[in-house]
Curated annotation (Swiss-Prot):
Signal peptide as annotated in the record: none
Cross-referenced InterPro entries: NT_sf (IPR043519)
Organism: Bacillus cereus (strain VD146)
Coiled coil: none
Family designation: Belongs to the CD-NTase family. D12 subfamily.
Name of the protein in its database record: Probable cyclic nucleotide synthase IK1_05630
Molecular function terms from GO: ATP binding; nucleotidyltransferase activity
EC number per UniProt: 2.7.7.-
Keywords recorded for this protein, A-Z: Antiviral defense, ATP-binding, Nucleotide metabolism, Nucleotide-binding, Nucleotidyltransferase, Transferase
Taxonomic lineage: Bacteria, Bacillati, Bacillota, Bacilli, Bacillales
Function, as annotated: Cyclic nucleotide synthase (second messenger synthase) of a CBASS antivirus system. CBASS (cyclic oligonucleotide-based antiphage signaling system) provides immunity against bacteriophage. The CD-NTase protein synthesizes cyclic nucleotides in response to infection; these serve as specific second messenger signals. The signals activate a diverse range of effectors, leading to bacterial cell death and thus abortive phage infection. A type I-B CBASS system. Probably a cyclic nucleotide synthase that makes second messenger nucleotide which activates a CBASS antiviral defense system.
Length: 331
């Protein structure tokens, strides 16, 4: 129970949205410990393909970008292999990796035509994970793009994605090649997502990641949801043409006003790979727009009530936005 809108909001963020700082520290240590074990696989696992020296492990996803919200359930990482002369052929709907005859360990994971089977690479990682201390189980991720490792000592799992790095093209650009879930491969580049989130956050004095997290919390409790990745990019698009920070509550109000209309618009993949990320159907867009409109009105009221010292009324407005997890007013 709380007495002011500020204390209610701070309590809500600390106890319902942001990861516990102690748990986050443990998670980072567990991640770094796992990195060390995985880097050693080519030495201790029979026929395990060679890793890319100096770039063996790449962190990505919301934990890496510090936009993860409670509960901490997974940590994403890429296990980057050396191509050993492997080349790729890009088609409209897939990428095929062509493994040379002298890449002995990779050749054990190819199709009959000599192309690398991404599911076999994932299976190789999965079968190798049992040597990890505290191993509990490993499974192929439901989309067949990663191996999910569960350790006996932690509540979170690790999603391990095999990857290769391309050579730079004529424009000095390189990509990561990862499984597409069908045995072939696709392009990605988590460096761009990481850099965009970091640079935008720094531009607004370290406040943007916190706003992303609270919006993601709001999104998870909607009947009509936006994918987490799309939502992050909509928030970053909101800040694209802004020049200063108005305060968290004011920016939440501004974001929901923006979301009312921007949910109908295109939001493009900053990596330039997937095109328009906003593939929601019209009814979903309409539902989200209506919800955003209601949130804008309630936050606007909450700010007005707080300015008048009417904290109980302000808190009730915030509860309409974020639900019962938002603390109640203490008389």
């Amino acid at each position: 129970m709380v007495k002011t809108a500020n204390s209610a909001y701070d309590n809500f963020i600390k106890n319902s949205v942001d990861l516990d700082s102690e748990q986050t520290g443990i998670a980072r240590n567990s991640r770094d410990w796992l990195y060390g074990n995985l880097k050693n696989f080519p030495k201790v696992v029979e026929n395990f393909p060679k890793l890319y020296a100096g770039k063996e492990i790449i962190g990505f996803g919301s934990f890496r970008r510090r936009t993860k919200i409670r509960p901490l359930d997974d940590i994403d990482l890429m296990l980057v292999f050396t191509g050993e002369g492997t080349t790729y052929t890009e088609y409209a709907d897939k990428i095929v990796l062509n493994v040379p005859g002298d890449a002995d360990k990779l050749r054990k994971l190819v199709n009959d035509d000599g192309t690398l089977n991404s599911i076999r690479v994932i299976e190789k990682i999965k079968s190798s994970l049992s040597i990890i201390p505290q191993y509990k189980k490993a499974e192929i991720h439901r989309r067949q793009e990663a191996t999910t490792l569960e350790l006996s000592t932690y509540d979170w799992v690790f999603d391990i994605v095999p990857a290769f790095i391309t050579s730079e093209n004529a424009y000095g650009k390189s990509y990561y090649i990862i499984p597409d879930g069908s045995g072939n491969w696709k392009k990605t580049d988590p460096r761009i997502d990481n850099e965009r989130a970091t640079e935008t956050n720094q531009k607004f004095d370290g406040n943007v990641l916190g706003l992303i997290r609270v919006i993601k919390y709001w999104n998870t409790n909607r009947s009509k949801k936006i994918s987490s990745y799309l939502m992050e990019n909509i928030v970053l698009d909101y800040f694209q043409n802004k020049f200063y920070w108005n305060g968290m509550k004011q920016e939440l109000r501004g974001f929901f006003e923006y979301l009312k209309t921007s949910i109908y618009n295109s939001h493009y993949d900053p990596k330039g790979i997937q095109g328009d990320l906003n593939t929601l159907d019209y009814n979903t867009k309409l539902s989200i727009s209506n919800q955003a409109s209601g949130c804008f009105e309630n936050i606007d009221l909450a700010i007005r009530y707080e300015s008048l010292g009417q904290h109980k009324e302000a808190i009730e407005c915030w509860k309409k936005v974020f639900g019962d997890e938002f603390p109640s007013h203490e008389d």
